[in-house]
């Protein structure tokens, strides 16, 4: 049956149903169901979160100064970003300011997370949707070396290097123990890279696996550990003693120099390996420009990385803030997190209960009351769902909307907003990337564009880290060693009631926490995370979310090997290591694979 959504998508669920379950995400587990027509083109998409987070319930009546330690545990990969959002929310509620050094250190930690997450995402969670590992066994190492040297001056590019890696890969494959490469769709016609490009990509996969652990040392220096570094309402928990030995976590010159050397290395890797790899791989997929979904229509960015401490105005934020709707890039709307008419969450298709489910609630007034009921046309049981009924409740994810619009968030959304604002630091790299591939601007709104935006942002973030590291050192040398403001640390200094909002741009997109404090305890707490925006189910008007929209009208080579579904869903940066099930219309399993 065909239905046209208010946001412009024609849905038809009459064709064969394919179920991919589970696709594990940072904030929980995810399931995708699609209907394909006789030509194996996706005509209906259903995205569902299959785990209840419930952190809001856990936080009620707790000390707001401790909220960061709980919210940080929502996610173990984008570690720290929920903590930063939480301390900003508490600071906003209580009117707490932070020192300039704390702002620089927070930015360094957040930017290090951006680079680490983007590198890990591309090489270890997404690249194998584009790269055929087994094909690399037939590559010519000399030709691979020529290819690698043609795109960058990265030193690890000799024929001998690739020959040695190919030999190790061959032994790996012949052993039958493929480890991270097990159960891929190797040999699928959906792969387009020549063997040499595949071998180069596998080499860089392994190099990135080794390199990523260096980046997080920045978190251990400033935050004591990784994952889940320490944070502090009012600043950062690391004192500065440039002439000291670094005992008891104090920052001295030795540690500052170590951070500087790590920044140099990550800039080099971004600019000589990561971005060139994305461009090289993209050159073979120029005709696969599916997966745009909402990216060319409605995008949202909160902005982040404040230039100055305590200034969260759009002018101060180095990552852009704004909303674009209906594909009109000539108008970027301001965003106000406190305006109850802007951001609202709906639950008509979510496994929650509202007083009136036809109306949305602003997060300050949000309710997190579970209501797990399947739609009347669902197949299976609550504990063994075979097919969801998208006409009823079908997800643990709420449906946030900005002024009633479903929005995409993430690196692509950020760069589309920056591009629309004609900011050269965003527009020029995008134009160059597309020009080098001989692609039009419209190609940005695709799965490939989403992947490219993440690489471009990683390069940008590395350079910003150099800027804030130099700024921190200069400020310390000028005699300022303050890292925390504890003037309002004691609850006796707080008002009887207060409310605030904290926001960041997590690697995966716009993230905000809303808090209400009453009698020094948390009275209400709501998180709206990037996956809530992108993975949202339908709303009362029938608008579909970003995941669902991105899959629409995508052709599949083989529905029993849903590589195209994973390629697009992964471009939003899900983390996964789980089973995939492909079902026929009557619920019989056609194939079972491990998603990598």
Curated annotation (Swiss-Prot):
EC numbers: 1.12.99.6
The membrane topology noted for this protein in its Swiss-Prot or TrEMBL record is: Peripheral membrane protein
Q: Does the keyword Cell membrane apply?
A: yes
Q: Which of this chain's residues are annotated to bind Ni(2+)?
A: 75, 78, 575, 578
Pfam families recorded: NiFeSe_Hases
Q: Which GO terms describe its molecular function?
A: ferredoxin hydrogenase activity; hydrogenase (acceptor) activity; nickel cation binding
Choose one Gene Ontology CC annotation of this protein and give it.
plasma membrane
Question: Which InterPro entries does its entry note?
Answer: Ni-dep_hyd_lsu, Ni-dep_hyd_lsu_Ni_BS, NiFe-Hase_large, NiFe/NiFeSe_hydrgnase_LSU
* Root EC class: oxidoreductase
Provide the cofactor list for this protein.
Ni(2+)
Q: How and how many cofactors are bound, per the record note? A: Binds 1 nickel ion per subunit.
User: Which reactions does this protein catalyse?
Assistant: H2 + A = AH2
Q: Which UniProt keywords apply?
A: Cell membrane, Membrane, Metal-binding, Nickel, Oxidoreductase
Q: Which PROSITE patterns match?
A: NI_HGENASE_L_1, NI_HGENASE_L_2
Q: How does it assemble?
A: Heterodimer of a large and a small subunit.
Give a short account of what the protein does: This enzyme recycles the H(2) produced by nitrogenase to increase the production of ATP and to protect nitrogenase against inhibition or damage by O(2) under carbon- or phosphate-limited conditions.
> In its UniProt entry, what is this protein called?
Uptake hydrogenase large subunit
Please name the source species: Bradyrhizobium diazoefficiens (strain JCM 10833 / BCRC 13528 / IAM 13628 / NBRC 14792 / USDA 110)
Gene (UniProt): hupB
